[in-house]
């Protein structure tokens, strides 16, 4: 059963200077692992930050359809991260304990990420069962 679906696109140019931000600033939104990945190739950092930000926005939208509990965007950001699986496929890792109304359910998270030089897009689907 589909619990929620979210999609978000962002202009990558908004993230052009994020590689100059302090780790403390970046850690308000991203995990240490994500920051390291985004900064590893400076020429790609804007697209990498942008698509991970879009993933959070898409998850936030999908979550809003299946959860009556109000959680701020920044709180949600600290409990969600994009990781690359051993096969190199992006996955959204969620700390479900922050979402008590949903933590008892077996929820699958499907994510698709894409970006060009100028636009980053993410789609998230939440499914129960």
For the regions a language model picked out, list residue spans one by one.
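Core catalytic alpha/beta fold that binds nucleotide/phospho-ligands
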Residues: 1-129
